[in-house]
Curated annotation (Swiss-Prot):
Molecular function in Gene Ontology: haptoglobin binding; heme binding; hemoglobin alpha binding; metal ion binding; organic acid binding; oxygen binding; oxygen carrier activity; peroxidase activity
PANTHER family: HEMOGLOBIN FAMILY MEMBER, HEMOGLOBIN SUBUNIT BETA
Pfam families: Globin
Summary of subunit composition and partner proteins: Heterotetramer of two alpha chains and two beta chains.
List of residues that carry Phosphoserine: S45
Keywords: Acetylation, Heme, Iron, Metal-binding, Oxygen transport, Phosphoprotein, S-nitrosylation, Transport
UniProt similarity note: Belongs to the globin family.
Cysteine disulfide partners in this protein: none
Name assigned to this protein: Hemoglobin subunit beta
Modified-residue entries (Phosphothreonine), positions: T13
Gene that encodes it: HBB
SUPFAM superfamilies to which the protein is assigned, alphabetical: Globin-like
UniProt source species: Papio anubis (Olive baboon)
């Protein structure tokens, strides 16, 4: 559960309504793979990840980034039940994919950076603070099934 004030919730949903999920998702996942290259090991089937340009232009990275942001969008609609919303994804990433849950925090922080880049002055410190709460809540929910 994420505790947002009504103002924070409005800020999050208002900005999210302007997000191009295809573009932002691919950029966020791509930046994660470039900035934290050890995360690439989970994406062996994605082909060429040999350089920042290859990662950022990789269609599989873009497609998976869109999928990730689709799940994030779903979470925004269920802020009162993030653990339930992300239960299956948590189990998948824990039991089958063996993803270090710290990576969820990294991706959340990268997403905040990408949003700041895309929205500039509209991404005020108050909006950032609200999004930091949301990405922390999502990361916590995704780590929930870990032992």
């Amino acid at each position: 559960m994420v505790h947002l004030t009504p103002e924070e919730k409005n800020a999050v949903t208002a900005l999210w309504g302007k997000v191009n999920v295809d573009e932002v998702g691919g950029e966020a996942l791509g930046r994660l793979l470039v900035v934290y290259p050890w995360t690439q090991r989970f994406f062996d089937s994605f082909g060429d990840l040999s350089s920042p340009a290859a990662v950022m232009g990789n269609p599989k990275v873009k497609a998976h980034g869109k999928k990730v942001l689709g799940a994030f969008s779903d979470g925004l609609n269920h802020l009162d039940n993030l653990k339930g919303t992300f239960a299956q994804l948590s189990e998948l990433h824990c039991d089958k994919l063996h993803v270090d849950p710290e990576n969820f925090k990294l991706l959340g922080n990268v997403l905040v950076c990408v949003l700041a880049h895309h929205f500039g002055k509209e991404f005020t410190p108050q909006v950032q603070a609200a999004y930091q709460k949301v990405v922390a809540g999502v990361a916590n929910a995704l780590a929930h099934k870990y032992h």
